[in-house]
Amino acid sequence: MEYGLIGAKLGHSYSKIIHEMLCGYHYDLCPLPTEEEARAFLAKRQFKAINVTIPYKKLVMEYCSYIDPRAKAIGAVNTVVNKNGLLYGYNTDYMGFSHLCDAHGVNFAGRTVLILGTGGTHNTTSAVARDKGAAKVLTVSRHPDPEKGELSYAEAVSSGAQIVINTTPAGMYPNVGVCNLDVAAMPDLEAVVDVVYNPDKTELILRAEEAGVPVAVGGLEMLVAQAVYAAEYFLDRKFEDAPVEIRRITAALRRDMLNIALIGMPSSGKTTLGRMLAKSLGRTFVDLDEEIVKTDGRSIPDIFAAEGEDGFRTKETAETQRFGKEGRQLISCGGGIVKKPENLRALHQNGVILFIDRPVDALAVGGGRPLSSSTVSYTHLRAHETDQYLV
C-alpha cells in the first residue's frame, strides 16, 4: 500500500473517494480491527503515507520519530508520512476543524464554548477554540467528572454558552435521530458545529436549525479539509488554493452522496419522474408506497381499510426513516408524506427535497389512492397541504 487509511472500522469512510478525487493516486482502506494488527502494520512501515482514524490516533505516536508540535500538544496524530523509514506525524484534524469554523463564520473570540464528549476529537476542537480566543471552554459528558469541571447535559443547557461543538458519535449513521442536548432551550447560541458527517445533518443540526441558531453545520467540510491538508503532507507540496479545492470536493461529494426526495400531490408524476431521474443519475430508485406494500404484504387501500390513515402513516414513517438515512437514492414519496413532520426530518437529514407542483386539473383521480378518490378530495388536499409541501 502506498497511500491509505487505517482504523478499526472503515466501512462508511469517504476518505478513498476524497483522496482519489483530489489527487488521482490510489488510496486504500485498511481496516485493522485489533491493536495487535495495527502495531504489526505500523512496525512494517510498508507505505508512503497514511491517515489514521479511531482508535489508533494515540497509538501511532509511539512509532513516530517526529511529531508536529501541534499534534503533540493535542495528543493525537491522524497523518503519517514515511520518510526513508522514519515516520513523521501530524494532526490535520485541527486544520480541518479550523477551516470549517472559518468558512462558516464561527466567531470564538470572547465566547463560552461547550464541547460535547471527552474523546480524542474533544482535544482537537478545544485547541482550535482556545487558539481562536474563546473565553471559556466547557466539557459536557453523559458521566461528568466534577473534579475535572465537566458538566452534565442538563447543566449544559443553563451554561450560557454561545457555541456548541459535538465530538461524540450521537446521531451518527446508522443510529440517526439521537440528540442529547436541548438546544431549543439555549437562547444565547450563535453556532452549533457537529463533527459527524454522516448523515449530512444530524438530529443536533436539524434541531439547531429549527431553533433559529445562526450557524448550524455538520462535519463533511471538515473531513474534506483535513484530507486536503493531509494530501499536502503526502505529496510534500501545497495546493495553489486549498480553500477552493475544499469547497469543490465538498460540493461534489454532497451532490453524489445525498438523496433526492420527490414530494407532491398524489398522481403528480413523482414515480415516473423518479424512475427517469434515477436511471439518468445512476441512483437507486425507491418508491416508499411500494416499500410499504412489500413490508406489510397488503395493498395501500387494504391497509387504509383495516387500520385507517393513522395506521398507514405509522408504516409510512417507518419506511421513510429506514431509507432516509441512506444515501445516493432517488426517493419517490407518497402524497401525504408531509402530514407528519418527522417524515420531512428523516428526508432532510441526508437529502434534498424537491416539490413536484402540478395543477389539480392535470392530476389523475382515483386509481386506488385513498387521499385522491375524487376531484373534490384533491382540491381539499391541495388547499390544506400546499404550505407543508413548501416547508
Map each language-model feature to its residues.
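NAD(P)-binding Rossmann-fold cofactor-contacting core
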Residues: 134-147
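Phosphate/diphosphate ligand-binding glycine-rich loop within oxidoreductases
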Residues: 2-104, 199, 205-207, 211, ...
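Conserved phosphate-donor/acceptor-positioning beta-strand/loop module used by diverse small-molecule
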Residues: 347-367
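Adenosine-phosphate binding glycine-rich loop
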Residues: 195-257
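Rossmann-like adenosine-cofactor binding region
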Residues: 148-216, 337-344
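ATP-dependent small-molecule kinase phosphotransfer cores
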Residues: 290-348
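Conserved small/polar residues in nucleotide/adenosyl-binding loops
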Residues: 379-386
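Glycine-rich adenosine-cofactor-binding loop
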Residues: 7, 91, 110-130, 264-266
